[in-house]
Curated annotation (Swiss-Prot):
Function per UniProt: Catalyzes the phosphorylation of the position 2 hydroxy group of 4-diphosphocytidyl-2C-methyl-D-erythritol.
The protein, known as: 4-diphosphocytidyl-2-C-methyl-D-erythritol kinase
GO biological process entries: isopentenyl diphosphate biosynthetic process, methylerythritol 4-phosphate pathway; terpenoid biosynthetic process
Chain positions recorded as ATP binding sites: 98-108
Keyword Transferase: yes
MF terms in GO: 4-(cytidine 5'-diphospho)-2-C-methyl-D-erythritol kinase activity; ATP binding
Family to which this protein belongs: Belongs to the GHMP kinase family. IspE subfamily.
EC number: 2.7.1.148
Keywords: ATP-binding, Isoprene biosynthesis, Kinase, Nucleotide-binding, Transferase
Pathway entry: Isoprenoid biosynthesis; isopentenyl diphosphate biosynthesis via DXP pathway; isopentenyl diphosphate from 1-deoxy-D-xylulose 5-phosphate: step 3/6
């Protein structure tokens, strides 16, 4: 969508981890994971306006983060060296995905910047080259560049497309910010889950999140949200938290539960997607 001042609008959808297992710790300190990533229609909007002077300007950094530390700014900076001309861009973020929630909002914004600017700046990078570039920004960025529901392994760069049944999700966000670094360094964190031999949606059930027990112990508010949503369905934490979600087959069922919990928590009703909206642009 074009705006009167020359900006163009691009979607940046959120994700849920329907299953998340930690299969080991690497020599570099990072962890190997296996996870089912699912796109949902809760999304930010990234507004971009091209410049021809090489400047990258982020007009509204999120949460007081310095411009140079924002993932969207860093994404443009990383890609700029591949541009054919003196390429620049102005960036605005319309945030609808809550931060510190395990929904991948910042990573999705960065992926959208990479996908669009790769075309605008005529960088010519393939999808897998963009995935390698995005991995330097964060473990969730490769999935959003991949652009469809997937089984991810390793540090998030190994991606296999996965068919996920159409579902609706009720998501609640407790009033707390979970430190991902704190959870990954927790001594009692499960780090030895067995790797999946045949990773299909059916074979991986029952789903679980290896970080959930530690987060519940360290952040009681997340446990309370889980307990509340569990009254209505099979609830689970996404990512390292803090959001809790439950899946439903019918929109009406999900909507009724959403109404129940929205008076207690910041809550969202979201539909699962099969592919990134940018794949249709």
């Amino acid at each position: 969508m074009n705006i009167a001042d020359g900006r163009q609008a691009f979607p940046a959808p959120a994700k849920l981890n329907l299953d998340l297992r930690i299969t080991g710790r690497r020599e570099d300190g990072y962890h190997n994971i296996e996870s089912i990533f699912c796109l949902i229609d809760l999304q930010d909007t990234v507004y971009l306006k091209p410049r021809d002077d090489g400047k990258i300007i982020l007009h509204n950094p999120v949460g007081g983060i310095p411009q140079e530390a924002d993932l969207s700014y860093r994404a443009a900076s990383l890609l700029q060296k591949y541009a054919r001309n003196l390429a620049g861009v102005e960036i605005w973020l319309d945030k609808k995905i809550p931060t510190g929630a395990g929904l991948g909002g910042g990573s999705s914004d960065a992926a959208t910047v990479l996908l669009v600017l790769n075309r605008w700046w005529q960088c010519g990078l393939t999808q897998w080259q963009l995935i390698d570039l995005g991995a330097a920004l964060g473990a969730d960025v490769p999935f959003f560049i991949f652009g469809k529901n997937a089984f991810a392994s390793g540090i998030g760069k190994k991606l296999i497309g996965m068919d996920i049944p159409k579902q609706w999700y009720v998501i609640v966000k407790p009033p707390v910010h979970v430190s991902t670094a704190k959870i990954f360094t927790y001594e009692g964190l499960t780090r030895d889950s067995a790797s999946s031999i045949m990773p299909t949606f059916q074979n991986l059930q029952p789903f679980r999140n290896d970080m959930q027990a530690v987060v519940f112990k360290e952040y009681p508010e997340v446990w309370k949200a889980y307990s509340e949503l569990s009254k209505y369905g099979s609830a689970m934490m996404t990512g390292s938290g803090a959001c809790i979600f439950a899946a439903f087959q019918a929109r009406n069922s999900a909507y009724n539960i959403y109404r129940q919990v929205s008076g207690l928590y910041e809550a969202y009703l979201a539909e699962g997607l099969s592919k990134h909206p940018l794949l249709s642009v």
